[in-house]
UniProtKB/Swiss-Prot annotation:
Enzyme class, first EC level, given as a word: translocase
Lineage of source species: Eukaryota, Metazoa, Chordata, Craniata, Vertebrata
GO BP annotations, alphabetical order: ATP synthesis coupled electron transport
Species of the source: Papio hamadryas (Hamadryas baboon)
Complexes and interactors: Core subunit of respiratory chain NADH dehydrogenase (Complex I) which is composed of 45 different subunits.
Keywords (A to Z) from UniProt: Electron transport, Membrane, Mitochondrion, Mitochondrion inner membrane, NAD, Respiratory chain, Translocase, Transmembrane, Transmembrane helix, Transport, Ubiquinone
Name by which UniProt lists this protein: NADH-ubiquinone oxidoreductase chain 4L
Length: 98
């Protein structure tokens, strides 16, 4: 395993660990989730550049689009919860059920 792959894997693992530790606050969870997506994006971009195939080069861009959509939905939910309840605790999500 090259040092680049090891660093990217370590970044993903640290983000996953942060997600498990700070799971009670939505903002911290969103930041950790974004760190996981960025490390996956970099890993996919490195793998695509090593593959030398033009069909694989579109995969990191697609992953980046999904990460942006996920961040937008998460931030919209965060704003909605913080405006309604004044807190960003994840246990407030159960109060949003219809």
């Amino acid at each position: 395993m090259t040092p680049t792959h090891m660093n990217i894997t370590l970044a993903f693992t640290i983000s996953l660990l942060g997600m498990l530790i700070y799971r009670s606050h939505l903002m911290a969870s969103l930041l950790c989730l974004e760190g996981m997506m960025m490390s996956l994006f970099i890993m996919t971009a490195v793998m695509a550049s090593n593959a030398h195939s033009p069909l694989i080069n579109i995969m990191p861009i697609i992953m980046l689009v999904f990460a942006a959509c996920e961040a937008a939905v998460g931030l919209a939910l965060l704003v909605s919860i913080s405006n309604t309840y004044g807190l960003d605790h994840i246990n407030n999500l159960s109060l949003l059920q219809c």
